[in-house]
Design a protein with these regions (language model features):
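Type-3 copper protein
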Residues: 35, 45-48, 71, 77
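Elongated alpha-helical scaffolds
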Residues: 56-93, 99-101
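Extended, amphipathic alpha-helical scaffolds
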Residues: 225-310
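Short loop/turn segments at secondary-structure transitions that flank enzyme active sites
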Residues: 43, 82-86, 154
């Protein structure tokens, strides 16, 4: 199934949601509170806060010894042992969690759907491990989910600007803020253009202004939906912004649609940061080259205005 989906959706893997325990992180310990995603090989992983009741789905790890002060940042990855042809690929023993098999046993209490009686059963679950940059990941399928950095006083925190490969833009607070920022900017531009159109007489409508207003009116509802729902795939968001940029290049010739950054699933921060800069620069160019000049009626059919030499 994964191979068939990948044929039509090559970027259908990545993080859906990830949260680290902030208290543990302050004590140099990496522990997942929530982790949902699709591994590059199509394996689904889902770790929820309720899993903590059973001692945690993934064993936490200390960063001591892995994150010296000389290191700019520390990559945090999750890994699952690759499937071994001929096995073994599972150990149905909850005490064998350190074995490098793809699946290990986990005892959980499950209520019967008919009687409601609760029983403890043994389930096989993915043997998800926490890995750090610089470690040997041979034999593991890995997904980089976060970057850690040191702040003032050596305090460890999550690097906000790192956007992991993801299947939902809500996986990255930074990406969500970027979309909201663009939405606010474009909405403000649209209101300004609409006010100018309403104030102008039918005989003095500006075709360039009409074109800009049309472009913004067509794209604002789509960006608004992405911002509210947050479930769009990053590639879908990229195509949306690329189309917006292409249409803006009609009224801003300095904006070359063939010079846009390429979509990079491994570097979403760089991709969308550059797209955001291109759009903002084009709109800023409009502010620079357009100036409102007040006219005063001198006599019939004669208007006068003071034009700055600049």
């Amino acid at each position: 199934l994964h191979e068939r989906v990948r044929a039509v959706r090559p970027f259908g893997w990545g993080v859906i949601d990830v949260r680290l325990d902030q208290e543990d992180l302050a004590n140099a310990m990496v522990r997942f509170v929530t982790l949902e995603g699709v591994m590059p090989d199509g394996t689904l992983i889902r770790i929820l806060p309720s899993d903590l009741e059973n001692g945690g789905f993934v064993l936490p790890r200390s960063i001591d010894g892995s994150f010296p002060p000389s290191l700019d940042h520390l990559d945090v990855l999750v890994g699952i042992p690759t499937e071994r042809p001929g096995g073994p690929n599972w150990v149905l023993d909850e005490d064998a969690g350190t074995a490098p098999t793809r699946y290990v046993g986990m005892r959980v209490g499950i209520a019967d759907l008919n009687s409601g009686e609760k029983r403890e059963i043994l389930l096989a679950r993915e043997n998800v491990r926490i890995l750090f940059s610089g470690e040997d990941a041979t034999g593991f399928i890995t997904l980089k989910v976060a970057e850690l950095e040191r702040g003032a006083g050596g305090k460890v925190s999550i690097r906000d600007s790192y956007v992991p490969p993801c299947v939902s833009m809500s996986a990255s607070p930074w990406l969500m803020r970027l979309v909201r920022g663009l939405l606010e900017l474009l909405s403000a531009k649209r209101k300004g253009l609409a006010a100018q159109q309403l104030a102008a007489s039918p005989a003095s409508l500006d075709q360039a202004r009409c074109s800009r207003l049309h472009i913004l009116n067509a794209h604002l509802p789509l960006l608004s939906h992405c911002s509210l729902v947050g479930q769009a795939h990053p590639e879908s968001l990229y195509l949306m912004l690329a189309r917006l940029t292409g249409e803006l290049s009609t009224v801003f010739p300095s904006l070359d649609p063939m010079d846009l950054p390429k979509y990079d699933h491994f570097n979403l921060y760089g991709t969308f940061r550059e797209m955001d800069l291109r759009i903002r620069q084009a709109l800023k160019e409009e502010d620079i080259r357009v100036e409102t000049i007040a006219l005063s009626l001198m006599s019939e059919c004669i208007w006068q205005a003071a034009v700055s030499s600049e």
